[in-house]
Amino acid sequence: MTRSFLDLADAGAAGVRLMLDEAVSRKKARAGLPKGAPDRDAPLAGHTLAMIFEKNSTRTRVSFDMAMRQLGGTTIVMDAGSMQLGRGETIADTARVLSRYVDAIMIRTDDHRKAVDLARYADVPVINGLTDRSHPCQIMADLQTILEHKGRVEGLGWAWLGDGNNVLHSIVEAGSLLGFPVRIGCPEGYDPDAEVLAEARARGGDILLSRDPAEVVRGADVVVTDTWISMGQAHAEEKLAAMMPFQVDEARMAQAAPDAAFLHCLPAHRGEEVVDAVIDGPHSLIWDEAENRLHAQKAVLLWCLGRLG
């Protein structure tokens, strides 16, 4: 059975836990292997992943490519300038054609609806590599990182400071599925999507939205932020001024739990959402987090292609 992975809820709590266990296990099993060597069982030998990029990427592109290589498979990379989808071919037609050529499709796009439509018309699994609504693969890596360092994810308090964006949406979703509270600190006008919050609360999610960054971070086990300003974004100076009280600096981290972890999906704008002393400091797990994109996405690929559960 094949399954698409557009949001964490597609897998449910049991599926997410299954993928996390697989990611941790496969990472340990690779000890001593060169990065380009396949896993010893090469479970996706002969399989091909098509990767559609409508947004530039470093981590998503390299981590998915290496994930498929380590699983024994191959990838094909496409962008809007090199495929007919960028010149008027419908999503439905693209999905049907690609389904005849490849075993799975990953898409990174500004338009979540495209990912949904691609999954609707494709006969193979579709994976959300990032959309304007959510970033589930990133949060799988975040969850794996916390699981490795703290031994659990359930019950740990997560604090988010900054823009109410796609990464936050997936954290909120994860909290509602796995049972950890999420406290959100955003300036007025930059809140997360109300529908995302409502869906999470309907699943029993414990969510606090506050304008007070100290209230949000106090005692938190995990502190997370992301870039505030996207390339070419209008009114950047106005947004930057609104966000500055939510910067993660040493004083803010000191308000969290003594052993709190700091996460950032990268790339970081140092001196804006986070200062060097935090991102390079003892609380920071960002390099493990970045590496775990690879391992978490291997588990996602296996789940989507019916090799897990």
From Swiss-Prot:
Residues at which L-ornithine binds: N166, D226, S230, M231
Recorded GO MF terms: amino acid binding; ornithine carbamoyltransferase activity
Keyword Transferase in record: yes
Annotated carbamoyl phosphate binding sites: S57, T58, R59, T60, Q84, R108, H135, P136, C137, Q138, C265, L266, R293
Keyword Kinase carried by entry: no
Keyword entries, A-Z: Amino-acid biosynthesis, Arginine biosynthesis, Cytoplasm, Transferase
Chief site of localization: cytoplasm
Catalytic activity: carbamoyl phosphate + L-ornithine = L-citrulline + phosphate + H(+)
Domain of life of the source: Bacteria
HAMAP family linked to this entry: OTCase
Stated name of the protein: Ornithine carbamoyltransferase
Organism from which the protein derives: Rhizorhabdus wittichii (strain DSM 6014 / CCUG 31198 / JCM 15750 / NBRC 105917 / EY 4224 / RW1) (Sphingomonas wittichii)
Taxon lineage: Bacteria, Pseudomonadati, Pseudomonadota, Alphaproteobacteria, Sphingomonadales
